[in-house]
Amino acid sequence: MTKGILGKKVGMTQIFTESGEFIPVTVIEATPNVVLQVKTVETDGYEAVQVGFDDKREVLSNKPAKGHVAKANTAPKRFIREFKNIEGLEVGAELSVEQFEAGDVVDVTGISKGKGFQGVIKRHGQSRGPMAHGSRYHRRPGSMGPVAPNRVFKNKRLAGRMGGNRVTVQNLEIVQVIPEKNVILVKGNVPGAKKSLITIKSAVKAAK
């Protein structure tokens, strides 16, 4: 069965194991998520569990949103997402960090940091031209392709907006779970800025 929870990225730090090994970790705060709706094949065409995370003031919610969360007897939520392959939960149930334990392998999803409009060197890692000796080619995109088509092909790597994409990092290891603080420590880095929404769920490609 899949495990899943929504959380907020706090930042990065480091811990040491008993053997003295140094491990960089990302701190993710995941206060209890509330099950708002259980979707079934009969009513919705597919099976999923809809959960809400991070309370917000009622004045910021409209009537339909208030009615939706009232069924779960909870406050309006800032973030609402779905998890599939989670069974045995009812509306109003809570998902906490205690479902995970050290050593679990998870997939972590977030929105990468936006970098704005960037050139091909920063955006795609293209090599630059000579910077001196009369060169007139420094940081330009280079060849646009052959002459014959009389056009630039789709997907040509050019300058443009960079970052701000939905990114999933697979097979990250949970180093430690701290239930009293609703915190999960994940080995390595995860996408997104501080305070951004993070989705943690069981890895789909984990070694069995």
From Swiss-Prot:
It comes from the Bacteria. Keywords: Ribonucleoprotein, Ribosomal protein, RNA-binding, rRNA-binding. GO terms for biological process: translation. Residues 122-148 are annotated as: Disordered. The keyword Transport does not apply. GO terms for cellular component: cytosolic large ribosomal subunit. One of its GO terms (molecular function) is rRNA binding. HAMAP family: Ribosomal_uL3_B. Part of the 50S ribosomal subunit. Forms a cluster with proteins L14 and L19. One of the primary rRNA binding proteins, it binds directly near the 3'-end of the 23S rRNA, where it nucleates assembly of the 50S subunit. Belongs to the universal ribosomal protein uL3 family. This is Large ribosomal subunit protein uL3. It comes from Streptococcus pyogenes serotype M1.
